[in-house]
Amino acid sequence: MKTVTVKNLIIGEGMPKIIVSLMGRDINSVKAEALAYREATFDILEWRVDHFMDIASTQSVLTAARVIRDAMPDIPLLFTFRSAKEGGEQTITTQHYLTLNRAAIDSGLVDMIDLELFTGDADVKATVDYAHAHNVYVVMSNHDFHQTPSAEEMVLRLRKMQALGADIPKIAVMPQSKHDVLTLLTATLEMQQHYADRPVITMSMAKEGVISRLAGEVFGSAATFGAVKQASAPGQIAVNDLRSVLMILHNA
């Protein structure tokens, strides 16, 4: 299986990489969070752009991206606008969603973008090609905050992401029972053993799904999300606690 290397970080080998999300609502809070996060230990910084209030102005978004990059020049930066339909904070048109992602790619400030699978195949493929032409990696994602699809359906979605050119397919689902958590882990293992030729990220959310955020190295998830301050999704745990558990499992 091939790995993804971003700023000397190798995703897809060894311990799952820890991603934390920055969720400032304006330039000042973005800067304050970025400076505060320098004290934490993690591998990838995700900027959740949907929390930023001035998304109507592409220039304001890029100014904030520059602030983050200046604060942490050596950390891989993932640009993510999470749509409202997949659990995000704001609703925007598909066209503006694509415009923001292309502007981020053009800026040279971000290393990766998050691109939602169900944006539309043609737009997704065009954006993937555009990102790759500018040496930007694509995390292609799907989130279900209401349920856990069947293992077969989750594998199909991850395989479709792979077929559309995702560098890292990602799926996050909400369990309604402990069996749902096992379904997510089953899908992850199935993908890893039979279909994946690149790193994959999976998680089951909320308290019941926490085990999936810890056991990625066992079942085949290459990264996991932790919280420095505020969690960006249900079930995230503090980065220091997360790293301790990941190290225990890695060294066992």
UniProtKB/Swiss-Prot annotation:
Regulation: Inhibited by (2R)-2-methyl-3-dehydroquinic acid.
Annotated catalysed reactions: 3-dehydroquinate = 3-dehydroshikimate + H2O
Coiled coil: none
Listed InterPro entries: 3-dehydroquinate_DH_AS, Aldolase_TIM, DHquinase_I, Type-I_3-dehydroquinase
Pathway assigned to this chain's UniProt record: Metabolic intermediate biosynthesis; chorismate biosynthesis; chorismate from D-erythrose 4-phosphate and phosphoenolpyruvate: step 3/7
Residues the record marks as active site: H143 (proton donor/acceptor), K170 (schiff-base intermediate with substrate)
GO molecular function, one term: 3-dehydroquinate dehydratase activity
E.C. number(s) listed in UniProt: 4.2.1.10
One Pfam family hit: DHquinase_I
Record key words, sorted: Amino-acid biosynthesis, Aromatic amino acid biosynthesis, Lyase, Schiff base
GO terms under biological process: 3,4-dihydroxybenzoate biosynthetic process; amino acid biosynthetic process; aromatic amino acid family biosynthetic process; chorismate biosynthetic process
Residues that coordinate or bind 3-dehydroquinate: S21, E46, W47, R48, R82, R213, S232, Q236
Family statement drawn from the similarity comment of this UniProt entry: Belongs to the type-I 3-dehydroquinase family.
Function: Involved in the third step of the chorismate pathway, which leads to the biosynthesis of aromatic amino acids. Catalyzes the cis-dehydration of 3-dehydroquinate (DHQ) and introduces the first double bond of the aromatic ring to yield 3-dehydroshikimate. The reaction involves the formation of an imine intermediate between the keto group of 3-dehydroquinate and the epsilon-amino group of Lys-170 at the active site.
UniProt name for this protein: 3-dehydroquinate dehydratase
Organism of derivation: Salmonella typhi
